[in-house]
């Protein structure tokens, strides 16, 4: 098995390798793991404690500006094309979001061709941003409050003012972030919406493993990525930790069993 491994926000290949060592020690020794580093510098506007994070560190993108998300996606897709084939993709946090985006885009653009991966593993992953759901354009009012304007995309032609963009799952995260740093941004700011499981015509038919911590402090790390996939081909577990990999031995063993069972199901 050959896996493409994608790190999270403000991470690096080296850090992801270190965090994966406890789980890969429970997997077959002849499996290969190839790591791709993201291409953008993270910002304190997204992560206030960035100075405390070991350097070097990278992000796939910062705020979900359409051009930045597209650049990250195109870079990843080109790498898979040039350095593949890979048997599986393994994404942590934002890397998991990018892995899900790659599979969703394949489903949308090449539904009748084989997927680029036979299986996918997601650790502490969250929903990716979508190129087809339109954008929310945020601007500052005279009272220094954020005012959203919905610009419809191919999928969400019915949203308009029906949603509370400050509370909706797919914009509340970005709203909270830009509201916290609004004095340091140039407005208006156009941000992509996220995919929803209800957006896709059918669940992704790729065997998958989904792992998240019960103490994850990011509320947007939930069951949503799992719900993108065919439930008959998806396996999931939770562990006692937070936004990280399982650390207790019995949890690592269970995680490894899920991965190995998924690999066995491929043949």
UniProtKB/Swiss-Prot annotation:
One of its GO terms (biological process) is secondary metabolic process. The active site is at 93 (charge relay system), 183 (charge relay system), 243 (charge relay system). Pfam families: FSH1 (PF03959). GO terms for molecular function: hydrolase activity. Fusaric acid is phytotoxic to plants such as cotton and banana. It has been shown to induce programmed cell death in plants. In addition to a mild toxicity to animals, fusaric acid exhibits acanthamoebicidal, antioomycete, and antimycobacterial activities. Induction: Expressed under high amounts of nitrogen via regulation by AREB. Moreover, components of the fungal-specific velvet complex VEL1 and LAE1 act also as positive regulators of expression. Finally, the pH regulator PACC acts as activator of FUB expression after the pH shift to alkaline ambient conditions. Keywords: Hydrolase. Its EC number is 3.1.-.-. Disruption phenotype: Impairs the production of fusaric acid. GO terms for cellular component: cytoplasm; nucleus. The keyword Hydrolase applies. It comes from the Eukaryota. The keyword NAD does not apply. Pathway: Mycotoxin biosynthesis. Hydrolase; part of the gene cluster that mediates the biosynthesis of fusaric acid, a mycotoxin with low to moderate toxicity to animals and humans, but with high phytotoxic properties. L-aspartate is suggested as fusaric acid amino acid precursor that is activated and further processed to O-acetyl-L-homoserine by cluster enzymes aspartate kinase FUB3 and homoserine O-acetyltransferase FUB5, as well as enzymes of the primary metabolism. Belongs to the AB hydrolase 3 family. This is Hydrolase FUB4.
